[in-house]
Amino acid sequence: MEIENDILIDDLLRRTKQSTERVKRFERLPISQLRFKSGSRWSILECLEHLNLYGDFYLVEIEKQIIANRNRPPSRIFRSGFVGNYFANLMEVKEGKITKMKSPKNKNPANMDLTITTISRFLKQQEQLTVLLNSCRSIDLTRAKSAISLTRLIKLRLGDTLRFFTYHIERHMLQAERICKEQIL
């Protein structure tokens, strides 16, 4: 995949804004609805906590790479790597459908005692992501590399990491909205 940096960042900012707006609607729900579970599936709060756990890693990693690469000349074009493009495409919601995957144990929030603070923590992370995405406008997203949460042995191009992380948020927003709709039916 090849795309202009600004077009990519604008798309990721749009997706981040949509996710933020979706979660702000969840703030008005009673805690019982936020904790509601259907079978072995996650609750709305568990979906958000899962994203918070990933945010704890990726937001720090993204910021670290922005700082490490800010003095390099930026490139106008982002060229996705093979592995990064694969992971990003695996996460992306396509036609309202998501590929089901098993979450790593350290990112699985099932049966945690979660409160409304899970939502405020998520919204703070979304604010931080917005700032970082805007900072990426002056970074070469192809040359800058970032670690991934599964293993430190693999590094992705920063643009692919941004896509993966943003698409991952989007897929769990869809999951949380489905949980919310199930309760209404």
Across the structure, where does each feature detected by a protein language model lie?
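A short small-residue
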Residues: 1-2, 33-34, 102-110, 149-152
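Extreme N-terminal tail/first-helix region
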Residues: 1-17, 21
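Active-site oxyanion-binding pockets that recognize sulfate/phosphate
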Residues: 2-9, 41-44, 111-119, 155, ...
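Short amphipathic alpha-helical segments with heptad-repeat character
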Residues: 10-13, 17, 48, 52, ...
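Intrinsically disordered, low-complexity segments enriched in polar/charged residues with Gly/Pro
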Residues: 12-13, 20-21, 27-29, 151-153
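Acidic/histidine-rich alpha-helical segments that form the ligand environment
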Residues: 19, 25-28, 84-140
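Short, contiguous alpha-helical
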Residues: 34-89, 127, 131-135, 139-185
